[in-house]
């Protein structure tokens, strides 16, 4: 699905020559991401694109421990340095490209701007901060700061189990 979205934005859907496709891709996009960090793609001097695959129209969108974004911010801890440095920017509009797929067939594709889909980031960060503070108030626990919401270490009597506190 991600390659199809790249091809759709780069106008290379019917390009069979891989070298020509790659040249066009490098002209159109300033950043091609990875599976672990948002976004998947950034258009040069343009919007960020996050590709999401679902199996049916009513399925939930997996956000991989990250809250939905109404905008992409360069100070977001979830993005990579390569993304942050791909061009000079502080805030970008983000497009969610949501595809309904079955095996290798694309049934539906929606393009939804983040500001039509998600609340502002302070809504999500406020909730995350409140959860962290609440967990820290529990007596006799060892709380660790992580890139996620946090971790409680040694939750069992043997001290061998940790509880990861993750976002969405």
Residue ranges of predicted features:
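Nucleic-acid endonuclease domains
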Residues: 1-47, 53-168
């Amino acid at each position: 699905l991600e390659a199809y979205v790249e091809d759709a934005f780069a106008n290379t859907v019917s390009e069979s020559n891989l070298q020509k496709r790659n040249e066009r891709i490098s002209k159109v996009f300033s950043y091609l991401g990875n599976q672990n960090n948002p976004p998947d793609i950034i258009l040069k001097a343009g919007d960020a694109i996050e590709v999401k695959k679902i199996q049916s129209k009513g399925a939930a969108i997996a956000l991989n421990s990250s809250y939905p974004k109404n905008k992409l911010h360069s100070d977001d801890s979830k993005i990579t340095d390569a993304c942050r440095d791909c061009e000079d920017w502080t805030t970008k509009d983000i497009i969610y490209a949501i595809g309904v797929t079955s095996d290798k067939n694309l049934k539906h594709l929606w393009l939804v701007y983040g500001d039509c889909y998600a609340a502002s980031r302070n809504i999500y960060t406020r909730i995350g901060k409140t959860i962290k503070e609440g967990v820290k108030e529990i007596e006799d626990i060892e709380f660790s700061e992580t890139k996620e919401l946090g971790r409680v270490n040694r939750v069992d009597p043997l001290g061998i189990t940790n509880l990861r506190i993750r976002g969405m």
